[in-house]
Amino acid sequence: MAKFRRRTCIILALFILFIFSLMMGLKMLRPNTATFGAPFGLDLLPELHQRTIHLGKNFDFQKSDRINSETNTKNLKSVEITMKPSKASELNLDELPPLNNYLHVFYYSWYGNPQFDGKYIHWNHPVLEHWDPRIAKNYPQGRHNPPDDIGSSFYPELGSYSSRDPSVIETHMRQMRSASIGVLALSWYPPDVNDENGEPTDNLVPTILDKAHKYNLKVTFHIEPYSNRDDQNMYKNVKYIIDKYGNHPAFYRYKTKTGNALPMFYVYDSYITKPEKWANLLTTSGSRSIRNSPYDGLFIALLVEEKHKYDILQSGFDGIYTYFATNGFTYGSSHQNWASLKLFCDKYNLIFIPSVGPGYIDTSIRPWNTQNTRNRINGKYYEIGLSAALQTRPSLISITSFNEWHEGTQIEKAVPKRTSNTVYLDYRPHKPGLYLELTRKWSEKYSKERATYALDRQLPVS
Protein backbone atom coordinates (compact mmCIF):
# COMPACT_ATOMS: atom_id res chain seq x y z
CA MET A 1 0.00 0.00 0.00
CA ALA A 2 2.85 2.38 0.91
CA LYS A 3 4.60 1.48 -2.34
CA PHE A 4 1.40 2.31 -4.27
CA ARG A 5 1.06 5.70 -2.56
CA ARG A 6 4.72 6.49 -3.28
CA ARG A 7 4.28 5.61 -6.94
CA THR A 8 1.10 7.72 -7.11
CA CYS A 9 2.93 10.70 -5.59
CA ILE A 10 5.77 10.34 -8.08
CA ILE A 11 3.36 10.21 -11.03
CA LEU A 12 1.44 13.23 -9.71
CA ALA A 13 4.68 15.20 -9.24
CA LEU A 14 5.81 14.37 -12.77
CA PHE A 15 2.41 15.42 -14.14
CA ILE A 16 2.56 18.76 -12.29
CA LEU A 17 6.11 19.31 -13.57
CA PHE A 18 4.94 18.59 -17.13
CA ILE A 19 2.05 21.07 -16.85
CA PHE A 20 4.35 23.73 -15.39
CA SER A 21 6.91 23.22 -18.19
CA LEU A 22 4.18 23.43 -20.82
CA MET A 23 2.86 26.70 -19.37
CA MET A 24 6.32 28.23 -19.24
CA GLY A 25 6.94 27.19 -22.84
CA LEU A 26 3.73 28.84 -24.01
CA LYS A 27 4.54 31.98 -22.06
CA MET A 28 7.94 32.28 -23.69
CA LEU A 29 6.60 31.61 -27.20
CA ARG A 30 7.11 34.58 -29.54
CA PRO A 31 6.48 34.32 -33.29
CA ASN A 32 9.49 35.58 -35.23
CA THR A 33 7.80 36.14 -38.53
CA ALA A 34 4.35 37.36 -37.59
CA THR A 35 3.75 40.55 -39.55
CA PHE A 36 1.10 43.15 -38.96
CA GLY A 37 -2.25 42.34 -40.26
CA ALA A 38 -1.23 38.65 -40.00
CA PRO A 39 -3.37 36.96 -37.36
CA PHE A 40 -0.96 34.10 -36.67
CA GLY A 41 0.59 34.25 -33.25
CA LEU A 42 -1.03 37.45 -32.07
CA ASP A 43 -3.34 35.73 -29.61
CA LEU A 44 -0.31 34.18 -27.89
CA LEU A 45 1.08 37.54 -26.89
CA PRO A 46 0.20 38.88 -23.44
CA GLU A 47 0.36 42.40 -24.85
CA LEU A 48 -2.86 42.02 -26.84
CA HIS A 49 -6.37 42.12 -25.45
CA GLN A 50 -9.71 43.74 -26.10
CA ARG A 51 -9.85 47.51 -25.65
CA THR A 52 -13.10 49.43 -25.52
CA ILE A 53 -13.49 53.16 -25.92
CA HIS A 54 -16.36 55.02 -24.31
CA LEU A 55 -17.88 57.42 -26.78
CA GLY A 56 -21.47 57.56 -25.63
CA LYS A 57 -24.47 55.79 -27.09
CA ASN A 58 -23.04 55.45 -30.60
CA PHE A 59 -20.21 53.13 -29.60
CA ASP A 60 -20.35 49.43 -30.52
CA PHE A 61 -18.32 47.59 -27.89
CA GLN A 62 -17.89 44.58 -30.13
CA LYS A 63 -15.63 46.57 -32.46
CA SER A 64 -12.64 47.19 -30.25
CA ASP A 65 -8.93 46.53 -30.36
CA ARG A 66 -6.85 43.66 -29.11
CA ILE A 67 -5.12 44.54 -25.88
CA ASN A 68 -3.18 43.01 -22.99
CA SER A 69 -5.00 40.41 -20.93
CA GLU A 70 -2.72 41.36 -18.08
CA THR A 71 -4.46 44.70 -17.69
CA ASN A 72 -7.12 43.20 -15.44
CA THR A 73 -5.39 44.90 -12.53
CA LYS A 74 -7.66 45.56 -9.59
CA ASN A 75 -8.39 48.95 -8.13
CA LEU A 76 -6.49 51.08 -10.65
CA LYS A 77 -7.22 54.64 -9.61
CA SER A 78 -8.04 57.41 -12.06
CA VAL A 79 -4.98 59.39 -13.09
CA GLU A 80 -4.91 63.12 -12.43
CA ILE A 81 -4.66 65.58 -15.31
CA THR A 82 -0.87 65.65 -15.02
CA MET A 83 0.96 63.13 -12.87
CA LYS A 84 4.50 63.43 -11.65
CA PRO A 85 6.82 60.52 -12.51
CA SER A 86 8.13 58.56 -9.59
CA LYS A 87 11.53 59.61 -8.35
CA ALA A 88 12.66 56.03 -8.66
CA SER A 89 12.39 56.44 -12.43
CA GLU A 90 14.78 59.38 -12.50
CA LEU A 91 18.29 58.55 -13.65
CA ASN A 92 21.65 60.03 -12.82
CA LEU A 93 22.47 61.75 -16.09
CA ASP A 94 26.18 61.68 -15.31
CA GLU A 95 26.08 57.89 -15.47
CA LEU A 96 24.42 57.76 -18.88
CA PRO A 97 26.27 57.16 -22.15
CA PRO A 98 26.90 60.14 -24.43
CA LEU A 99 24.10 61.63 -26.50
CA ASN A 100 23.84 60.47 -30.09
CA ASN A 101 23.15 63.48 -32.32
CA TYR A 102 22.60 61.15 -35.26
CA LEU A 103 19.52 59.71 -33.58
CA HIS A 104 16.44 61.94 -33.96
CA VAL A 105 12.95 61.56 -32.51
CA PHE A 106 9.70 63.17 -33.70
CA TYR A 107 8.14 65.26 -30.94
CA TYR A 108 4.64 66.75 -30.66
CA SER A 109 3.72 69.79 -28.55
CA TRP A 110 0.02 69.92 -29.44
CA TYR A 111 -1.51 68.53 -26.21
CA GLY A 112 -3.51 70.65 -23.78
CA ASN A 113 -5.62 70.41 -20.65
CA PRO A 114 -7.86 72.75 -18.63
CA GLN A 115 -5.17 73.46 -16.06
CA PHE A 116 -2.85 75.14 -18.59
CA ASP A 117 -4.98 75.71 -21.69
CA GLY A 118 -8.51 76.17 -20.39
CA LYS A 119 -9.65 73.04 -22.22
CA TYR A 120 -8.46 69.68 -23.47
CA ILE A 121 -6.55 69.75 -26.73
CA HIS A 122 -5.88 66.62 -28.79
CA TRP A 123 -6.63 64.25 -25.89
CA ASN A 124 -10.29 64.75 -26.87
CA HIS A 125 -9.54 63.90 -30.50
CA PRO A 126 -12.63 63.06 -32.58
CA VAL A 127 -13.15 59.64 -34.06
CA LEU A 128 -12.42 60.06 -37.76
CA GLU A 129 -14.96 58.78 -40.24
CA HIS A 130 -14.06 56.34 -42.98
CA TRP A 131 -14.35 57.89 -46.45
CA ASP A 132 -16.78 55.16 -47.55
CA PRO A 133 -20.20 55.85 -45.93
CA ARG A 134 -21.04 52.15 -46.07
CA ILE A 135 -18.06 51.39 -43.85
CA ALA A 136 -18.32 54.54 -41.73
CA LYS A 137 -21.81 53.64 -40.49
CA ASN A 138 -20.40 50.57 -38.72
CA TYR A 139 -18.12 52.56 -36.42
CA PRO A 140 -18.56 55.00 -33.54
CA GLN A 141 -18.78 58.74 -33.88
CA GLY A 142 -18.02 61.53 -31.46
CA ARG A 143 -15.12 62.78 -29.39
CA HIS A 144 -13.11 61.28 -26.59
CA ASN A 145 -13.80 62.58 -23.10
CA PRO A 146 -10.60 63.15 -21.06
CA PRO A 147 -9.07 62.64 -18.63
CA ASP A 148 -10.15 58.98 -18.39
CA ASP A 149 -11.12 58.57 -22.05
CA ILE A 150 -8.41 59.89 -24.37
CA GLY A 151 -7.66 59.56 -28.07
CA SER A 152 -5.04 56.87 -27.61
CA SER A 153 -4.81 53.13 -27.05
CA PHE A 154 -2.15 53.73 -24.37
CA TYR A 155 -2.20 56.03 -21.33
CA PRO A 156 0.71 58.37 -20.50
CA GLU A 157 2.49 58.17 -17.17
CA LEU A 158 2.02 61.95 -17.00
CA GLY A 159 -1.72 61.69 -17.57
CA SER A 160 -3.57 63.91 -20.03
CA TYR A 161 -0.87 66.54 -19.84
CA SER A 162 -0.43 69.97 -21.37
CA SER A 163 2.49 70.64 -23.69
CA ARG A 164 2.60 74.09 -22.06
CA ASP A 165 3.42 72.68 -18.65
CA PRO A 166 7.14 73.43 -18.05
CA SER A 167 7.44 70.39 -15.77
CA VAL A 168 6.09 68.16 -18.55
CA ILE A 169 8.57 69.57 -21.07
CA GLU A 170 11.37 69.03 -18.56
CA THR A 171 10.29 65.45 -17.93
CA HIS A 172 10.21 64.80 -21.67
CA MET A 173 13.74 66.14 -22.07
CA ARG A 174 14.92 63.95 -19.20
CA GLN A 175 13.36 60.92 -20.84
CA MET A 176 15.00 61.70 -24.17
CA ARG A 177 18.33 62.26 -22.44
CA SER A 178 17.98 58.96 -20.60
CA ALA A 179 17.45 57.28 -23.99
CA SER A 180 20.63 58.86 -25.45
CA ILE A 181 18.60 60.64 -28.13
CA GLY A 182 20.50 63.72 -29.25
CA VAL A 183 17.93 65.58 -31.35
CA LEU A 184 14.17 66.09 -31.20
CA ALA A 185 12.37 66.95 -34.43
CA LEU A 186 9.64 69.33 -33.30
CA SER A 187 6.33 69.27 -35.14
CA TRP A 188 5.94 72.86 -36.32
CA TYR A 189 3.28 75.12 -37.79
CA PRO A 190 3.84 78.81 -38.57
CA PRO A 191 2.77 81.39 -35.96
CA ASP A 192 -1.00 81.57 -35.49
CA VAL A 193 -1.47 78.37 -37.52
CA ASN A 194 -2.42 74.96 -36.17
CA ASP A 195 -3.68 71.55 -37.17
CA GLU A 196 -7.44 71.05 -37.35
CA ASN A 197 -7.62 69.56 -33.85
CA GLY A 198 -5.15 71.84 -32.10
CA GLU A 199 -4.06 75.36 -31.26
CA PRO A 200 -0.99 77.36 -32.39
CA THR A 201 2.19 76.11 -30.73
CA ASP A 202 5.01 78.25 -32.12
CA ASN A 203 5.04 80.25 -28.89
CA LEU A 204 6.16 77.09 -27.07
CA VAL A 205 9.39 76.84 -29.05
CA PRO A 206 11.49 79.11 -26.78
CA THR A 207 10.65 77.01 -23.71
CA ILE A 208 11.32 73.77 -25.57
CA LEU A 209 14.69 75.10 -26.74
CA ASP A 210 15.62 76.19 -23.21
CA LYS A 211 14.62 72.88 -21.64
CA ALA A 212 16.40 70.94 -24.38
CA HIS A 213 19.58 72.93 -23.82
CA LYS A 214 19.48 72.11 -20.11
CA TYR A 215 19.96 68.45 -21.06
CA ASN A 216 22.32 69.15 -23.99
CA LEU A 217 19.69 68.14 -26.52
CA LYS A 218 19.26 69.79 -29.92
CA VAL A 219 16.04 70.81 -31.65
CA THR A 220 15.31 70.60 -35.36
CA PHE A 221 12.01 71.37 -37.07
CA HIS A 222 9.47 69.00 -38.62
CA ILE A 223 7.45 71.30 -40.87
CA GLU A 224 3.84 70.20 -41.09
CA PRO A 225 1.65 70.56 -44.24
CA TYR A 226 -0.01 73.82 -43.25
CA SER A 227 -2.66 75.25 -45.58
CA ASN A 228 -1.38 76.39 -48.99
CA ARG A 229 2.24 75.52 -48.23
CA ASP A 230 4.38 76.41 -51.25
CA ASP A 231 7.85 77.60 -52.23
CA GLN A 232 7.09 81.23 -51.44
CA ASN A 233 5.76 80.88 -47.90
CA MET A 234 8.26 78.11 -47.15
CA TYR A 235 11.07 80.59 -47.78
CA LYS A 236 9.35 83.03 -45.45
CA ASN A 237 8.88 80.41 -42.73
CA VAL A 238 12.41 79.03 -42.93
CA LYS A 239 13.69 82.59 -42.65
CA TYR A 240 11.44 83.12 -39.63
CA ILE A 241 12.75 79.98 -37.89
CA ILE A 242 16.40 80.79 -38.50
CA ASP A 243 16.07 84.48 -37.62
CA LYS A 244 14.13 83.79 -34.41
CA TYR A 245 15.68 80.56 -33.16
CA GLY A 246 18.90 80.06 -35.10
CA ASN A 247 21.16 81.62 -32.46
CA HIS A 248 19.86 79.47 -29.62
CA PRO A 249 22.49 76.97 -28.40
CA ALA A 250 19.95 74.13 -28.74
CA PHE A 251 19.23 74.90 -32.42
CA TYR A 252 20.39 71.89 -34.43
CA ARG A 253 22.82 72.04 -37.29
CA TYR A 254 24.21 69.10 -39.22
CA LYS A 255 27.79 69.14 -40.38
CA THR A 256 27.96 68.09 -44.03
CA LYS A 257 30.78 66.33 -45.84
CA THR A 258 32.10 69.72 -46.90
CA GLY A 259 32.30 70.84 -43.28
CA ASN A 260 29.37 73.26 -43.43
CA ALA A 261 27.00 73.20 -40.46
CA LEU A 262 23.47 73.69 -41.79
CA PRO A 263 20.02 73.66 -40.19
CA MET A 264 17.90 70.63 -41.01
CA PHE A 265 14.20 70.69 -41.84
CA TYR A 266 12.03 67.60 -42.15
CA VAL A 267 9.16 68.37 -44.54
CA TYR A 268 6.12 66.24 -43.81
CA ASP A 269 3.90 65.29 -46.78
CA SER A 270 6.34 67.02 -49.12
CA TYR A 271 4.83 65.12 -52.07
CA ILE A 272 1.69 67.29 -51.87
CA THR A 273 3.59 70.15 -53.51
CA LYS A 274 4.67 69.70 -57.13
CA PRO A 275 8.40 69.18 -57.76
CA GLU A 276 8.50 72.31 -59.93
CA LYS A 277 7.42 74.41 -56.96
CA TRP A 278 10.02 72.89 -54.67
CA ALA A 279 12.69 73.38 -57.33
CA ASN A 280 12.02 77.13 -57.24
CA LEU A 281 13.16 77.08 -53.63
CA LEU A 282 15.63 74.21 -53.38
CA THR A 283 17.74 74.37 -56.55
CA THR A 284 20.49 76.90 -57.16
CA SER A 285 18.79 78.05 -60.36
CA GLY A 286 15.33 78.33 -58.78
CA SER A 287 13.39 81.59 -59.01
CA ARG A 288 13.20 81.80 -55.18
CA SER A 289 16.35 79.83 -54.43
CA ILE A 290 17.33 79.55 -50.80
CA ARG A 291 20.65 77.96 -51.72
CA ASN A 292 23.90 79.67 -50.76
CA SER A 293 21.93 82.22 -48.75
CA PRO A 294 21.94 82.79 -44.97
CA TYR A 295 18.80 80.63 -44.89
CA ASP A 296 20.17 77.61 -46.71
CA GLY A 297 19.69 74.29 -44.99
CA LEU A 298 19.23 70.57 -45.40
CA PHE A 299 15.67 69.82 -46.50
CA ILE A 300 14.50 66.25 -45.97
CA ALA A 301 11.52 65.01 -48.00
CA LEU A 302 9.04 62.34 -46.96
CA LEU A 303 9.21 59.35 -49.29
CA VAL A 304 5.99 57.34 -49.35
CA GLU A 305 5.81 55.72 -52.80
CA GLU A 306 8.72 54.46 -54.88
CA LYS A 307 7.93 56.99 -57.62
CA HIS A 308 8.61 59.80 -55.16
CA LYS A 309 12.35 59.12 -55.49
CA TYR A 310 12.64 60.98 -58.76
CA ASP A 311 10.23 63.73 -57.71
CA ILE A 312 12.51 64.33 -54.73
CA LEU A 313 15.53 64.55 -57.02
CA GLN A 314 13.78 67.00 -59.32
CA SER A 315 12.65 69.07 -56.34
CA GLY A 316 16.17 69.64 -55.05
CA PHE A 317 15.76 68.05 -51.62
CA ASP A 318 18.87 67.03 -49.69
CA GLY A 319 17.58 63.73 -48.35
CA ILE A 320 14.64 61.48 -47.58
CA TYR A 321 12.97 60.08 -44.49
CA THR A 322 10.27 57.43 -44.26
CA TYR A 323 8.36 58.50 -41.10
CA PHE A 324 5.70 55.80 -40.82
CA ALA A 325 6.17 53.22 -38.08
CA THR A 326 4.11 50.65 -39.97
CA ASN A 327 6.35 48.15 -41.72
CA GLY A 328 4.63 47.26 -45.00
CA PHE A 329 2.22 50.20 -45.00
CA THR A 330 4.10 52.17 -47.66
CA TYR A 331 7.04 51.53 -49.95
CA GLY A 332 9.19 53.85 -47.86
CA SER A 333 8.20 52.40 -44.49
CA SER A 334 8.85 48.79 -45.58
CA HIS A 335 12.10 47.54 -44.11
CA GLN A 336 12.77 45.34 -47.12
CA ASN A 337 13.12 48.43 -49.34
CA TRP A 338 15.60 50.33 -47.20
CA ALA A 339 18.70 48.80 -48.73
CA SER A 340 17.71 49.87 -52.25
CA LEU A 341 16.66 53.32 -50.99
CA LYS A 342 20.05 53.71 -49.37
CA LEU A 343 21.76 52.79 -52.65
CA PHE A 344 19.62 55.34 -54.46
CA CYS A 345 20.53 58.03 -51.95
CA ASP A 346 24.22 57.21 -52.16
CA LYS A 347 24.09 57.39 -55.95
CA TYR A 348 22.55 60.86 -55.92
CA ASN A 349 24.30 62.22 -52.83
CA LEU A 350 21.17 62.31 -50.68
CA ILE A 351 20.91 61.75 -46.93
CA PHE A 352 18.96 58.58 -46.13
CA ILE A 353 17.08 58.67 -42.82
CA PRO A 354 15.04 55.52 -42.13
CA SER A 355 12.29 55.99 -39.55
CA VAL A 356 11.75 53.32 -36.91
CA GLY A 357 8.83 52.95 -34.51
CA PRO A 358 7.95 50.71 -31.56
CA GLY A 359 4.57 49.75 -33.02
CA TYR A 360 1.41 51.27 -34.41
CA ILE A 361 -2.23 51.39 -33.34
CA ASP A 362 -4.53 54.28 -34.23
CA THR A 363 -7.90 52.60 -33.75
CA SER A 364 -8.85 54.98 -30.93
CA ILE A 365 -9.26 57.65 -33.62
CA ARG A 366 -9.54 55.44 -36.75
CA PRO A 367 -11.45 52.38 -35.52
CA TRP A 368 -11.72 51.04 -39.08
CA ASN A 369 -7.92 50.91 -39.54
CA THR A 370 -7.12 47.66 -37.74
CA GLN A 371 -5.22 46.28 -40.73
CA ASN A 372 -2.40 48.73 -40.07
CA THR A 373 -2.00 47.89 -36.39
CA ARG A 374 1.52 46.72 -35.58
CA ASN A 375 1.89 44.78 -32.35
CA ARG A 376 4.86 45.83 -30.22
CA ILE A 377 5.65 42.22 -29.22
CA ASN A 378 7.12 43.48 -25.94
CA GLY A 379 9.76 45.54 -27.75
CA LYS A 380 10.71 43.01 -30.40
CA TYR A 381 9.08 44.94 -33.25
CA TYR A 382 11.09 48.03 -32.29
CA GLU A 383 14.36 46.14 -32.17
CA ILE A 384 13.72 44.47 -35.52
CA GLY A 385 13.18 47.91 -37.07
CA LEU A 386 16.29 49.38 -35.45
CA SER A 387 18.34 46.42 -36.64
CA ALA A 388 17.01 46.85 -40.19
CA ALA A 389 17.90 50.54 -40.10
CA LEU A 390 21.44 49.89 -38.85
CA GLN A 391 22.03 47.36 -41.61
CA THR A 392 21.76 50.15 -44.20
CA ARG A 393 24.58 52.09 -42.47
CA PRO A 394 22.58 55.34 -42.50
CA SER A 395 23.88 58.83 -41.83
CA LEU A 396 20.95 59.40 -39.44
CA ILE A 397 18.08 57.42 -37.92
CA SER A 398 14.74 58.91 -36.92
CA ILE A 399 12.31 57.49 -34.37
CA THR A 400 8.55 57.72 -34.86
CA SER A 401 7.81 58.91 -32.27
CA PHE A 402 8.39 60.27 -28.79
CA ASN A 403 4.75 61.14 -28.13
CA GLU A 404 2.35 60.67 -31.04
CA TRP A 405 -0.16 59.01 -28.74
CA HIS A 406 -3.03 58.97 -31.25
CA GLU A 407 -1.14 56.54 -33.48
CA GLY A 408 0.39 54.50 -30.68
CA THR A 409 3.96 55.11 -31.85
CA GLN A 410 5.20 56.72 -28.62
CA ILE A 411 8.29 55.67 -26.69
CA GLU A 412 7.29 58.01 -23.85
CA LYS A 413 6.43 56.24 -20.60
CA ALA A 414 2.97 54.69 -20.46
CA VAL A 415 1.18 53.12 -17.49
CA PRO A 416 -1.60 50.58 -16.94
CA LYS A 417 -5.03 52.16 -16.65
CA ARG A 418 -8.60 50.99 -16.74
CA THR A 419 -11.93 52.68 -16.19
CA SER A 420 -15.48 51.35 -16.27
CA ASN A 421 -15.48 51.57 -20.08
CA THR A 422 -11.84 51.58 -21.14
CA VAL A 423 -8.85 49.34 -20.63
CA TYR A 424 -5.63 50.74 -22.07
CA LEU A 425 -2.65 48.98 -23.53
CA ASP A 426 0.59 49.21 -21.59
CA TYR A 427 4.17 47.95 -21.68
CA ARG A 428 3.83 45.10 -19.16
CA PRO A 429 5.38 42.75 -18.22
CA HIS A 430 8.05 45.43 -18.58
CA LYS A 431 8.28 48.79 -16.85
CA PRO A 432 6.96 52.10 -18.27
CA GLY A 433 10.46 53.03 -19.40
CA LEU A 434 10.97 49.95 -21.60
CA TYR A 435 11.21 51.82 -24.91
CA LEU A 436 13.53 54.46 -23.50
CA GLU A 437 15.83 51.68 -22.30
CA LEU A 438 15.73 49.92 -25.66
CA THR A 439 16.43 53.20 -27.42
CA ARG A 440 19.45 53.81 -25.21
CA LYS A 441 20.78 50.32 -25.96
CA TRP A 442 20.44 50.78 -29.72
CA SER A 443 21.71 54.36 -29.60
CA GLU A 444 24.98 53.08 -28.15
CA LYS A 445 25.16 50.33 -30.75
CA TYR A 446 24.44 52.75 -33.59
CA SER A 447 26.99 55.25 -32.32
CA LYS A 448 29.73 52.61 -32.24
CA GLU A 449 28.87 51.17 -35.66
CA ARG A 450 28.50 54.58 -37.28
CA ALA A 451 31.92 55.65 -36.08
CA THR A 452 33.49 52.80 -38.06
CA TYR A 453 31.74 53.29 -41.39
CA ALA A 454 31.70 57.08 -41.08
CA LEU A 455 35.48 57.02 -41.18
CA ASP A 456 35.41 54.70 -44.20
CA ARG A 457 33.08 57.04 -46.11
CA GLN A 458 34.52 60.28 -44.72
CA LEU A 459 31.23 61.29 -43.10
CA PRO A 460 31.31 63.81 -40.27
CA VAL A 461 31.62 62.03 -36.92
CA SER A 462 30.66 64.90 -34.63
From Swiss-Prot:
Gene Ontology MF terms: alpha-mannosidase activity; glycoprotein endo-alpha-1,2-mannosidase activity
GO-annotated cellular components: Golgi apparatus; Golgi membrane
SUPFAM superfamilies (UniProt xref): (Trans)glycosidases (SSF51445)
Stretch list, region Catalytic: 60-462
Tissue: Highly expressed in the liver and kidney. Expressed at lower levels in muscle, pancreas, heart, placenta, lung and brain.
One of the Pfam families matching this protein, by short name: Glyco_hydro_99
EC supergroup of this enzyme: hydrolase
Subcellular location: Golgi apparatus membrane
Catalyzed chemical reaction(s): N-{alpha-Glc-(1->3)-alpha-Man-(1->2)-alpha-Man-(1->2)-alpha-Man-(1->3)-[alpha-Man-(1->2)-alpha-Man-(1->3)-[alpha-Man-(1->2)-alpha-Man-(1->6)]-alpha-Man-(1->6)]-beta-Man-(1->4)-beta-GlcNAc-(1->4)-beta-GlcNAc}-L-asparaginyl-[protein] + H2O = alpha-D-glucosyl-(1->3)-D-mannopyranose + N(4)-{alpha-D-Man-(1->2)-alpha-D-Man-(1->3)-[alpha-D-Man-(1->2)-alpha-D-Man-(1->3)-[alpha-D-Man-(1->2)-alpha-D-Man-(1->6)]-alpha-D-Man-(1->6)]-beta-D-Man-(1->4)-beta-D-GlaNAc-(1->4)-beta-D-GlcNAc}-L-asparaginyl-[protein] (N-glucan mannose isomer 8A1,2,3B1,2)
Residue intervals passing through the bilayer: 9-29
Entry-linked InterPro entries: Glyco_Hydrolase_99, Glycoside_hydrolase_SF
Stretches assigned to the Lumenal side: 30-462
CDD domains: GH99
EC numbers on record: 3.2.1.130
Keyword vocabulary terms for this entry: Golgi apparatus, Hydrolase, Membrane, Signal-anchor, Transmembrane, Transmembrane helix
pH dependence: Optimum pH is 6.2.
The family this protein is said to belong to: Belongs to the glycosyl hydrolase 99 family.
Protein name: Glycoprotein endo-alpha-1,2-mannosidase
GN (gene name): MANEA
